[in-house]
């Protein structure tokens, strides 16, 4: 790699990179990937600035060669590549002369035309992930961020790319060339995998002072010091009689171990109450898409352009009216909000050039729906600590809800195949070792089974919505930005397709902490009549907005089209996890892999091919009241994926608690089935811990009902 860097980059860049690494005590000969990354970043910064000038009139111009005497000023000041002291001197001088706010971290460039500092990023990972790491690190709205990737993708603050198309294409081509050159020398894989996120310095510290005293005070009885306790724990032998061990640990414990027999466990008690309601951030089986095939319109790929194009494919719009009101909401406001979206989309079309983003007018209906000015005023603690009856708000206990059949239908639907493919196979380099060949084979088989699965559509929809919402929350904090809900797929014939599910309008989003909430209103198309299962749609106001002609076996039929509108909220940390929903594919692939491994170790050879290609064999999928359900290996893949996706879509404290506590009971039952004669103490306490998580969450209630089916069949 070191030789490659010295051949591939200009000697001046190599020298600057070496200097920078030495300044931080790093050796270019050892940390060769870092050496290459620094050179690449420097080169991109220089290319960004090259040929860009400001003429006498203050206009930005591009001059590749010409009159050396022309009165031209460089458009960009290059800060990257200077030693730290000099770089800060330049930054301070710019701030003093222009009045621009001083950044906390050294930026890479200053743009005299845009009057802003620019942070350039070059990433081997996904641009949006790297963009967010940068944004989180510099935490400044004033510094403009522009990220390039080696795959030709880019991302910039507010989608403002500063440079013209051609200059950016030069940079992308150069990055692509570097990647090709590395790949041809077998260096790319190691370089790609070596990228870490933005690093923060963490201090290591010994436990001293107050913390040490607290540690000593909180030891169990009969221990004099922390070291003494540590030595005991390290030497604790975990085998032998449980009662003896417990009494050895503490005099207060006297646990009677009860044998756990087939007749011991009882079913979990599910709550009574009204049926549970839908609480996902977007519609699942009830969603309706307006789609365009082979999109090639101007601005294709810009969400707003795509959305308008999709909206134009539907001709059955009609005067909207409320068909299922929201019990607690002001329903006319939801109606007005939809009308406002239609009107503002119409306004955009009447403009000469469609903007890349659309901020909605702050009307009274949107202010109400987005909870503007509804947060209680924050008061400094110093001003109110003397108030005698200062107390926290009383919050109501959540109302218990019973299991409703719709959540099982949602799950069944998520396991089904659609007629489109939602994921592409990543380009991964040639397999080198035999183990890589097996891994690629497993991945390809697995991808073939799940690429058309509806759960995979939910993953891509979730990734898109969360990325777009987090982006808008950072880039347009005060604006009510209109965000189309879009996904992309390929048809059976391999044609590209862009789908619009509806729109989100984001509220104010000054998100300082990970858990700070941004409110949004979602408006989603559907053909589902909400009056069939009104309990499912408790949190929604549903409008009828049009009539759609559908082709059926008996010819064309007209069906009413509905719009499901609700106020919702999310946080930075939830959006971050939402953006990483692709991990669900990995989790379910690993579960399948452990099944293949078990089979392979019995047969003492790799069973991947037989596992996926033996269509006659069936596998256990899950429990139902009818008994153990079985299905093909593809069905197993899709069921595992759907479970993982629903764990992400319906993530909640109730699910965390239920999963952790019910697992303990599951292990005891498994031990009984394996004739290990398990014993338990305080089984009642375990049931209590499980059942306190069964309150109102549809996914948790469904899992509890599956668990009961499992208990019934496991203990026959």
From Swiss-Prot:
Binds 2 manganese ions per subunit. GO terms for biological process: cap snatching; DNA-templated transcription; symbiont-mediated suppression of host gene expression; symbiont-mediated suppression of host mRNA transcription via inhibition of RNA polymerase II activity; viral RNA genome replication; viral translational frameshifting. The keyword Phosphoprotein applies. A motif (Nuclear localization signal 2 (NLS2)) lies at residues 184-247. Its cofactor is Mn(2+). Mn(2+) 2 binds at residues 80, 108. It is found in: Host cytoplasm; Host nucleus. Pfam families: Flu_PA (PF00603). One of its GO terms (molecular function) is metal ion binding. Its EC number is 3.1.-.-. GO terms for cellular component: host cell cytoplasm; host cell nucleus. Plays an essential role in viral RNA transcription and replication by forming the heterotrimeric polymerase complex together with PB1 and PB2 subunits. The complex transcribes viral mRNAs by using a unique mechanism called cap-snatching. It consists in the hijacking and cleavage of host capped pre-mRNAs. These short capped RNAs are then used as primers for viral mRNAs. The PB2 subunit is responsible for the binding of the 5' cap of cellular pre-mRNAs which are subsequently cleaved after 10-13 nucleotides by the PA subunit that carries the endonuclease activity. Belongs to the influenza viruses PA family. This is Polymerase acidic protein. It comes from Influenza A virus (strain A/Turkey/Ontario/6118/1968 H8N4). The gene is PA.
């Amino acid at each position: 790699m070191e030789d490659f860097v010295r051949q591939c980059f200009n000697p001046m860049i190599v020298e600057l990179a070496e200097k920078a690494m030495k300044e931080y005590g790093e050796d270019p000969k050892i940390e060769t990937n870092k050496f290459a990354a620094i050179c690449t970043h420097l080169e991109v910064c220089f290319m960004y600035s090259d040929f860009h000038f400001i003429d006498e009139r203050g206009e930005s111009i591009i001059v590749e060669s010409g009159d050396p005497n022309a009165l031209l000023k460089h458009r960009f000041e290059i800060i990257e590549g200077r030693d730290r002291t000099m770089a800060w001197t330049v930054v301070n001088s710019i701030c003093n002369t222009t009045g621009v706010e001083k950044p906390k971290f050294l930026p890479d460039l200053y743009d005299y035309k845009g009057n802003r500092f620019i942070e350039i990023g070059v990433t081997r990972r996904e641009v949006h992930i790297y963009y967010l790491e940068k944004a989180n690190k510099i935490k400044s709205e004033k510094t403009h961020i522009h990220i390039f990737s080696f795959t030709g993708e880019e991302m910039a603050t507010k989608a403002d790319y500063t440079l013209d198309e051609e200059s950016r294409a030069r940079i992308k081509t150069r990055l692509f060339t570097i990647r090709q050159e590395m790949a041809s020398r077998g260096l790319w894989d190691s370089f790609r995998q070596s990228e870490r996120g933005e690093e923060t310095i963490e201090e290591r510290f010994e436990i001293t002072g107050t913390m040490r005293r607290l540690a000593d005070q909180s030891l169990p009885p009969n221990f004099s010091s922390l070291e003494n306790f540590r030595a005991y724990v390290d030497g604790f032998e975990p085998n032998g009689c449980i009662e003896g061990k417990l009494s050895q640990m503490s005099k207060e414990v006297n646990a009677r171990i009860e044998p756990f027999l087939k007749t011991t466990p009882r079913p979990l008690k599910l709550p009574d109450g009204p049926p549970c309601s839908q609480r996902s951030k977007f519609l699942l089986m009830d969603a309706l898409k307006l789609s365009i095939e082979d999109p090639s319109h101007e601005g294709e790929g810009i969400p707003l352009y795509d959305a308008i194009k999709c909206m134009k494919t539907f001709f059955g719009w009609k005067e909207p009216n409320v068909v299922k009101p929201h019990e607690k909401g002001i329903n006319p406001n939801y109606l007005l909000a939809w009308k406002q979206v239609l009107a503002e989309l119409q306004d955009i079309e009447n403009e000469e050039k469609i903007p890349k983003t659309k901020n909605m007018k702050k009307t009274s209906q949107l202010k109400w729906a987005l909870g503007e000015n509804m947060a209680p005023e924050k008061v400094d603690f110093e001003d109110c600590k003397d108030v005698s009856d200062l107390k926290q708000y009383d919050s109501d206990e959540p109302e218990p809800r019973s299991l409703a059949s719709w959540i099982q239908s949602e799950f069944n639907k998520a396991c089904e195949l659609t007629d489109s493919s939602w994921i592409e196979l990543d380009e991964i380099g040639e397999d080198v070792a035999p183990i890589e060949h097996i891994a690629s084979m497993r991945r390809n088989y697995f991808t073939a089974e799940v690429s058309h699965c509806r759960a995979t559509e939910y993953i891509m929809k979730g990734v898109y919505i969360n990325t777009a919402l987090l982006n808008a929350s950072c880039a347009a904090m005060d604006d009510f930005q209109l965000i189309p809900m879009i996904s992309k797929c390929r048809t059976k014939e391999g044609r590209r397709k862009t789908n619009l599910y509806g729109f989100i309008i984001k509220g104010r989003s000054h998100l300082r902490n990970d858990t700070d909430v941004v409110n949004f209103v979602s408006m989603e198309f559907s053909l589902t009549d909400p009056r069939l299962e009104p309990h499912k749609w408790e949190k929604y106001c549903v409008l009828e907005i049009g009539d759609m002609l559908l082709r059926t076996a008996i010819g064309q039929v007209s069906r009413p089209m509905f719009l499901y509108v609700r106020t919702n909220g999310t946080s930075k940390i939830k959006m971050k996890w939402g953006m990483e929903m692709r991990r669900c594919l990995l989790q379910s692939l690993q579960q399948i892999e452990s099944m293949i491994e078990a089979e392979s170790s019995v047969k003492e050879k790799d069973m991947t091919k037989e596992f996926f290609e033996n269509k006659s064999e069936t596998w256990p999928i899950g429990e139902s009241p009818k008994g153990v359900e079985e299905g093909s290996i593809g069905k197993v893949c899709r069921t595992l994926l759907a479970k993982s996706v629903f764990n992400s879509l319906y993530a909640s404290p109730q699910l965390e608690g239920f999963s952790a506590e019910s697992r303990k009971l599951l292990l005891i039952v498994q031990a009984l089935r394996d004739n290990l004669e398990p014993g338990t103490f305080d089984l009642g306490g375990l049931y209590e811990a499980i059942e306190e998580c069964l309150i109102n969450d549809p996914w948790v209630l469904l899992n509890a009902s599956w668990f009961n089916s499992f208990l019934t069949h496991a203990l026959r």
